[in-house]
């Protein structure tokens, strides 16, 4: 492996993050929300790429993870009066559990079968959103504008509707996802995931339990996707069934391939 490659990747990543951070001081305030949404969805794509780009597994059910984080966080705020950070934490924990559970079942298959199983789970999640409309409010969804309280850090409070706060929160999410993804690929676990992508049978012959490594990759991928969904709910104060539809699983696939 080229020793300079990790350094070049780290420098490129740092350059992108610095550019995006400084961009907020150049852009007019009314563009901050647009770029905030781009960075949140880019974080979703980074999470998806751990499964597809690193491990070679194509999923059509990632909208399930994104919407799980979104709905759990949104329901905690809307129905139970939680503030933003605790609601996000609960959404993250539930997404980890769902990712592990779905992965434990879906990874018993491979290839096209895995694609179909993830699609099946994704559609089940979408139909569940419509069925349990007493909590999700069905197809229309719900807004968090009135229920969501400002984030209080010490003596300072931050409104989730403030464009500057949105931008910096989205930038922080993207930075965490990007750095974590880069650290993973440079780690021994990341090398095994790449080996599985290239030749799973040969990796098994070397003594690695590929099922557990793939389960780890799917769990981490789903968790980052759910985290992006939770942050999206808080920053844009809307939770809706459209984020659980299949097109929201296809979108990160296209972003990753492009």
PLM region spans:
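Transmembrane alpha-helices and adjacent helix-loop boundaries
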Residues: 1-258
């Amino acid at each position: 492996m080229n020793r300079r490659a990790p350094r070049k990747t780290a420098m490129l990543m740092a350059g992108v993050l610095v550019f995006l951070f400084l961009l907020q001081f150049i852009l007019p305030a009314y563009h901050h929300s647009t770029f905030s949404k781009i960075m949140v969805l880019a974080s979703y794509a980074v999470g998806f790429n751990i499964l597809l780009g690193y491990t070679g597994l194509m999923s059509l059910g990632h909208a399930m993870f994104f919407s799980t984080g979104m709905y759990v966080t949104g329901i905690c705020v809307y129905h139970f009066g939680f503030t933003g950070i605790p609601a996000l934490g609960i959404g993250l924990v539930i997404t980890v559990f769902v990712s592990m559970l779905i992965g434990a079942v879906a990874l018993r298959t491979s290839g096209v079968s895995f694609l179909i199983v993830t699609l099946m789970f994704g559609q089940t999640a979408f139909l569940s959103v419509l069925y349990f409309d007493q909590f999700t409010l069905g197809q229309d969804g719900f807004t968090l504008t009135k229920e969501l309280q400002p984030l209080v850090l010490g003596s300072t409070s931050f409104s989730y509707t403030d464009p500057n706060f949105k931008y910096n929160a989205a930038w922080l999410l993207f930075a965490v996802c990007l750095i974590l993804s880069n650290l993973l690929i440079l780690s021994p676990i990341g090398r095994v995931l790449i080996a599985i992508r290239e030749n799973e049978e040969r990796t098994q012959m070397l003594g690695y339990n590929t099922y557990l490594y793939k389960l780890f990759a799917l769990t981490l991928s789903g968790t980052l996707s759910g985290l992006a969904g939770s942050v999206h709910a808080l920053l844009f104060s809307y939770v809706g069934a459209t984020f659980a539809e299949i097109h929201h699983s296809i979108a990160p696939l296209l972003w990753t391939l492009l």
